[in-house]
A protein has these predicted regions:
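Hydrophobic beta-strand segments that make up the repeating blades of beta-propeller
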Residues: 1, 44-48, 93-97, 143-147
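Structural signal for beta-propeller blades
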Residues: 3-6, 52-55, 101-104, 151-154
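Blade-edge motifs of beta-propeller repeat domains
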Residues: 5-26, 56-76, 107-125, 156-175
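Short coil/loop residues immediately preceding or within conserved phosphate-binding loops
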Residues: 28, 50, 77, 100, ...
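Beta-propeller blade termini
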Residues: 29-38, 78-87, 128-135, 175
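Glycine-aliphatic tripeptides that mark coil-to-beta-strand junctions in extracellular
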Residues: 40-42, 89-91, 139-141
C-alpha cells in the first residue's frame, strides 16, 4: 500500500511528483477537491474504505495541514459528492458507503465545520457511486446513488437538506 500523492502541474504540460498525503495504511477509493471552508483555497477530501475519511486544508503558504476526520472514523466509503443541500450557500458532503454501513450526509455548519450525520438509503446499501443533480426541476440538489445487487435510487431533496421521498431505477429491484 502507498500513500495518496499530489502531482504538481508544470507549464510544460507535464506533472512532477509532489507531496504524499495521508497515512500509508489508507484504503483510498475516491477523492474530491473543493473549497469547503470559504477561504478561496481548495481542500482535498479523501474517501477511504474501512478507514477514516480525511479533509486536508491549505495553509496561507499553500501547504496542506494534517487531515481532519469527517465521518465515523471507520467508514467504508467508496465515493463522495459535494454541493449545497440545504440552501445556506455552504458546501455539504455526501458519502456513499458499503459493507453494511449507512450512506451519510454531513451539513456544513456556519463555522465551516461538518455537524450531525444524516443517513440516507436503507442503512445497508452497497452504494458504489453518488452524484448530485436537480432531478425534478425544483431547484434543489437531489442525491443519485448507484448500488450493487439492489436498485439504484434518486433521493429527492425538500430544500432543507432532508430527503423524505425517493424512487428506484435500474438494478435488481426496479420496476
Amino acid at each position: 500500500r502507498q500513500q495518496s500523492r499530489i502531482y504538481l502541474g508544470q507549464k510544460e504540460k507535464k506533472f512532477i511528483r509532489g507531496p504524499a498525503i495521508g497515512p500509508v495504511i489508507q484504503n483510498t477509493r475516491n477523492l474530491i477537491v473543493a473549497d469547503l471552508d470559504g477561504d478561496k483555497k481548495p481542500e482535498i477530501l479523501i474517501a477511504n474504505r474501512r478507514a477514516a475519511n480525511l479533509i486536508y486544508n491549505h495553509t496561507t503558504k499553500g501547504d496542506l495541514l494534517k487531515g481532519r476526520i469527517i465521518g465515523s472514523g471507520a467508514d467504508s466509503t467508496i465515493d463522495v459528492a459535494i454541493g449545497d443541500l440545504n440552501g445556506d450557500g455552504l458546501p455539504d458532503v455526501v458519502l456513499a458507503n458499503r459493507d453494511g454501513q449507512p450512506n451519510a450526509i454531513y451539513l456544513n455548519n456556519d463555522n465551516r465545520q461538518f455537524g450531525n450525520t444524516i443517513a440516507y438509503g436503507t442503512g445497508k446499501d452497497n452504494t458504489r457511486s453518488v452524484t448530485l443533480a436537480d432531478m425534478n426541476g425544483d431547484g434543489h440538489l437531489d442525491i443519485i446513488a448507484a448500488n450493487v445487487a439492489q436498485s439504484n435510487r434518486v433521493f429527492f431533496n425538500n430544500g432543507k437538506g432532508a430527503f423524505p421521498k425517493s424512487t428506484s431505477f435500474g438494478g435488481a429491484q426496479s420496476p
